[in-house]
C-alpha cells in the first residue's frame, strides 16, 4: 500500500470479528457486529499545535488499537483492501 496520511490522521485495517455465536450459530446482517479493533498501517507526521509546532502521534505502525467507529471515520478501498482513515482523536486505546 502506497499511501501517507496527513497531520494527525491514521490509516487502520479493521480486525476480523467472530461470525459465530457462543452456541455455534452463524451471525449475519445486523447480528454480526463490526470490530472496533484495528491494526495501524500508516500514521501522519502529527498534530499541528496553535504555536505551529508539530506534536507527534502516540500510535505507531503495527499497533493494535480500539477506535470509535462513528462520525469522521472514512472508509476507502486501497489495493483491493478496505481500510479506514481516522483522526488520532478517534483512537480510544492501544492494546498492549
From Swiss-Prot:
Domain of life: Bacteria
InterPro entries associated with the record: Chaperonin_GroES (IPR020818), Chaperonin_GroES_sf (IPR037124), Chaprnonin_Cpn10_CS (IPR018369), GroES-like_sf (IPR011032)
PROSITE patterns in the record: CHAPERONINS_CPN10 (PS00681)
Keywords (A to Z) from UniProt: Chaperone, Cytoplasm
A Pfam family it matches: Cpn10
Annotated Gene Ontology cellular component terms: cytoplasm
Alphabetized SUPFAM superfamilies for the sequence: GroES-like (SSF50129)
Subcellular location: Cytoplasm
The family this protein is said to belong to: Belongs to the GroES chaperonin family.
Protein name per Swiss-Prot or TrEMBL: Co-chaperonin GroES
Origin species: Haemophilus influenzae (strain PittEE)
